[in-house]
From Swiss-Prot:
UniProt similarity note: Belongs to the class-III pyridoxal-phosphate-dependent aminotransferase family. HemL subfamily.
HAMAP family membership: HemL_aminotrans_3 (MF_00375)
Enzymatic reactions: (S)-4-amino-5-oxopentanoate = 5-aminolevulinate
Molecular function (Gene Ontology), one example: pyridoxal phosphate binding
Cofactor (UniProt): pyridoxal 5'-phosphate
Pathway note: Porphyrin-containing compound metabolism; protoporphyrin-IX biosynthesis; 5-aminolevulinate from L-glutamyl-tRNA(Glu): step 2/2
Protein's recorded name: Glutamate-1-semialdehyde 2,1-aminomutase 2
Natural source organism: Bacillus cereus (strain AH187)
Compartment(s): Cytoplasm
Keyword match Cytoplasm: yes
InterPro entries: 4pyrrol_synth_GluAld_NH2Trfase (IPR004639), Aminotrans_3 (IPR005814), Aminotrans_3_PPA_site (IPR049704), PyrdxlP-dep_Trfase (IPR015424), PyrdxlP-dep_Trfase_major (IPR015421), PyrdxlP-dep_Trfase_small (IPR015422)
SUPFAM superfamilies tied to this protein: PLP-dependent transferases (SSF53383)
GO cellular component, one term: cytoplasm
N6-(pyridoxal phosphate)lysine: residues carrying this PTM: K268
């Protein structure tokens, strides 16, 4: 049995200092019934907690660390920038370098604005969509999480799903009434919403792969249908690629599925592990953003040189060949997890998109939030705790996916499959 004495003591102290002892709810490990692990360091595919336990990491800071922890090139870039100054409140050339890479690789982006978080990116994109169209309502999907902006914290997933909250107290009814929610992968409901409110719907915002109800890919024709419906009704299509951006493919989720939105939100990978976000799209739309247009958005640390340098060094290391290797590794892990579950007769459903994998303990195909909620949460919690004992660090929520990095080796994946085999053998009915 692993010892967690130092993590337990640190969490006891933290609960007097921060709400729930953490700075983001899912980190409290509540849904898996254990004390949170306090991490000390990471290198490559491994993390080490303050009690000295080693884990193969599939959290990767919730997705950003696509090259694993403390990537040499990213670390050297950060050192070089920090020695010259960490922030100036003025433009720097590294902003141009990262912007060029983003524009080159993301089909929908002709102009991009850097911000500080994924939430900031989605909030800014909504304001832009409303300002550009002159409309008020937005359409989002039940269980899709787009950050904690008021307009988007309606029937959201992620930590909200983990905590069992349908919304959040503090979101005014006047804000909520302008957010239309329908089931993910349900194109007919989208069409019906446009029949009812089409003249006032500014945009549809969607994760190309729903990553905050587990991992739920789009059904064939769903994204294409959204593109068609929005174009027919004069609304903008926004892809929230904070999670899928540069994660599922070289050209992001929109390249992977061949559907080009009007606006795209980015985060996570483009900051290489530092706080970052971005939104971009067609030039005619983005030029409405201040100072070139009237739609205001600003940020003290937007385009921070540390985040820009980490993001640039992260992206330049990603090539089309990187994603071929991601696919191979992810297929290997997916097959191994499926084989272990089948061997022990454990109800399961595994979804995957590129290097994102979601395992649900249910017999039901998971194509939307209602299906995701059919998972056996008690079994997941027990499985999670056993995987920790086996030295595997997974996201502490049924409603989050696993992430792979370029640092994960075949040996890591084989060890993870072996750990899952042990865990499932102990937990089978």
């Amino acid at each position: 049995m692993k010892k967690f004495d130092k993590s337990i003591a640190a969490f006891e102290e933290a609960q007097d200092l921060m709400p729930g002892g953490v700075n983001s709810p899912v980190r409290a490990f509540k849904s898996v019934g254990m004390n949170p692990l306090f991490m000390e360091r990471g290198k490559g595919s491994k993390v080490y907690d303050i009690d000295g336990n080693e884990y193969i990491d599939y959290v990767l800071s919730w997705g950003p660390l696509i090259h694993g922890h403390a990537n040499d090139r990213v670390v050297e870039a950060l050192k070089a920038v920090a020695e010259r100054g960490t922030s100036f409140g003025a433009p720097t050339e590294i902003e141009n370098k990262l912007a060029k890479l983003v524009i080159e690789r993301v089909p929908s982006i002709e102009i991009v604005r850097m911000v500080n978080s994924g939430t900031e990116a989605t909030m800014s994109a909504l304001r832009l969509a409303r300002g550009y169209t002159g409309r008020n309502k937005i359409l989002k999907f039940i269980g899709c999480y787009h950050g904690h902006g008021d307009s988007l914290l309606i029937k959201a997933g992620s930590g909200v799903a983990t905590l069992g909250l349908p919304d959040s107290p503090g979101v005014p009814e006047g804000v909520a009434k302008n957010t239309i929610t329908v089931a993910y992968n349900d194109l007919e409901s989208v069409k019906y919403a446009f029949e009812q409110f089409g003249d006032d719907i500014a945009c549809v915002i969607v994760e190309p792969v729903a990553g905050n109800m587990g991992v739920v890919p789009p059904q064939p024709g769903f994204l294409e249908g959204l593109r068609e419906v929005t174009e027919q009704n004069g609304a903008l299509l926004i892809f929230d690629e904070v999670m899928t951006g540069f994660r599922v493919a070289y050209n992001c989720g929109q390249g992977y599925y061949g559907v080009t939105p009007d606006l795209t939100c980015l985060g996570k990978v483009i900051g290489g592990g530092l706080p970052v976000g971005a939104y971009g799209g067609k030039a005619e739309i983005m030029r409405q953003v201040a100072p070139s247009g009237p739609i205001y958005q600003a940020g003290t640390l937007s385009g921070n040189p540390l985040a820009m340098a980490a993001g640039y060094e992260t992206l330049v290391q990603l090539t089309p060949e990187s994603y071929v290797e991601f696919e191979r590794k992810a297929e290997m892990l997916e097959a191994g997890l499926r084989k272990a579950a089948e061997k022990h007769g454990i109800p399961h459903h595994i979804n995957r998109a590129g290097s994102m994998i979601g395992i649900f303990f249910t017999d039901e195909p998971v194509i939307n939030y209602d299906a995701a909620k059919s998972s056996n949460l008690e079994f997941f919690a027990a499985y999670y705790r056993e995987m920790v004992e086996q030295g595997v660090f997974l996201p502490p929520s049924q409603f989050e996916g696993l992430f792979l990095s370029t640092a994960h080796s075949d040996a890591d994946i084989e060890a993870t499959i072996a750990a899952a085999e042990i865990a499932m053998s102990k937990l089978k009915a």
